[in-house]
């Protein structure tokens, strides 16, 4: 399965729109995009998962690592466009309490 990734850089944040399936095979593609952003440490990151049809624990792990790196620079990770199914993953793992997870797609 292919992963579609679109990025936009704003003054105070990066926006990353993801489409497809986030799993052990495709997460490295997203990691290549997120790594320089989180290493930059000057902006929050908004990840829009509106067009993600499936996500496994590999995707969750990537977001935990991204959040940890961002928090070292007092920056935040926002997960937007979360479906009920993917939102449930964040909820049952307790990650919904650690990061900003929202069903909406509006960037603040």
From Swiss-Prot:
PTMs per UniProt = Phosphorylated by RsbW on a serine residue.
Q: Which domain of life is it from?
A: Bacteria
Which keywords accompany this UniProt record?
A: Phosphoprotein
The STAS domain sits at: 3-108
Q: Which SUPFAM superfamilies match?
A: SpoIIaa-like (SSF52091)
Q: Which residues carry this modification: Phosphoserine?
A: 57
Q: What GO annotations for molecular function exist for this entry? A: anti-sigma factor antagonist activity
A Pfam family assignment: STAS
| Function per UniProt | Positive regulator of sigma-B activity. Non-phosphorylated RsbV binds to RsbW, preventing its association with sigma-B. When phosphorylated, releases RsbW, which is then free to complex with and inactivate sigma-B.
NCBIfam families, per database record: ant_ant_sig
| Record-stated family | Belongs to the anti-sigma-factor antagonist family.
For this entry, the protein name equals Anti-sigma-B factor antagonist
Species, as recorded: Staphylococcus aureus (strain NCTC 8325 / PS 47)
Instruction: Tell me what gene encodes this.
Output: rsbV
